[in-house]
Amino acid sequence: IATVDCSDYPQPVCMGDYMPLCGSDSKTYSNKCNFCNAVVDSNGTLTLNHFGKC
């Protein structure tokens, strides 16, 4: 199972890096920062499906 450490999030500003991750909501997040901010917003209900685009 793929996991991402989001313990340092949320971050107020995400860089523009493009390293896509696919969330359990079937949305593609452009990078770890955007994904982790969404995880925090979801109170931990959002998880990582896999690395790469959905």
UniProtKB/Swiss-Prot annotation:
SS bond list: 6-36, 14-33, 22-54
InterPro entries (alphabetical): Bifunctional_prot_inhibitor (IPR051597), Kazal_dom (IPR002350), Kazal_dom_sf (IPR036058)
Matching SUPFAM superfamilies: Kazal-type serine protease inhibitors
One MF annotation (Gene Ontology) recorded for this entry: serine-type endopeptidase inhibitor activity
Residues flagged as site, Reactive bond 3: 16-17
Domain Kazal-like: 4-54
Compartment(s) where it occurs, according to its Swiss-Prot or TrEMBL record: Secreted
Glycosylation sites: 43
Source species, domain of life: Eukaryota
Recorded GO CC terms: extracellular region
Keywords, sorted A to Z: Disulfide bond, Glycoprotein, Protease inhibitor, Repeat, Secreted, Serine protease inhibitor
Gene3D superfamilies: 3.30.60.30
Domain notes: Avian ovomucoid consists of three homologous, tandem Kazal family inhibitory domains.
PANTHER family linked: OVOMUCOID-LIKE-RELATED, SERINE PEPTIDASE INHIBITOR, KAZAL TYPE 2, TANDEM DUPLICATE 1-RELATED
Protein name per the record: Ovomucoid
